[in-house]
């Protein structure tokens, strides 16, 4: 099972190795503006799932929000440690 750190390391490895056909690589090649819009979209889906959907659907939406937040972290050069100091 993945956690925040293991997901980050998986995504960072993809960013470094740039495997062909990777959705993460495609996302990293897009602008921060585009990635920011994706985070906003996913945050809205988390809210809607919290209001109207099952716990499983909510968990899935939260996982997608975490993914996109980490893509932005990697694009900007942040690590989990940079985030943890604010938790």
Swiss-Prot record:
Main location: cytoplasm
Any single biological process term in GO: L-histidine biosynthetic process
Catalytic activity: 1-(5-phospho-beta-D-ribosyl)-ATP + H2O = 1-(5-phospho-beta-D-ribosyl)-5'-AMP + diphosphate + H(+)
Pathway membership: Amino-acid biosynthesis; L-histidine biosynthesis; L-histidine from 5-phospho-alpha-D-ribose 1-diphosphate: step 2/9
Principal EC category: hydrolase
EC number: 3.6.1.31
Entry GO terms, CC: cytoplasm
InterPro entries to which the protein is assigned, alphabetical: HisE, PRib-ATP_PPHydrolase-like
Subcellular location: Cytoplasm
Alphabetically ordered keywords of this record: Amino-acid biosynthesis, ATP-binding, Cytoplasm, Histidine biosynthesis, Hydrolase, Nucleotide-binding
GO molecular function: ATP binding; phosphoribosyl-ATP diphosphatase activity
Similarity comment text for this entry: Belongs to the PRA-PH family.
NCBIfam families recorded: histidine_hisI, PRK00400.1-1
Protein name: Phosphoribosyl-ATP pyrophosphatase
Organism: Corynebacterium diphtheriae (strain ATCC 700971 / NCTC 13129 / Biotype gravis)
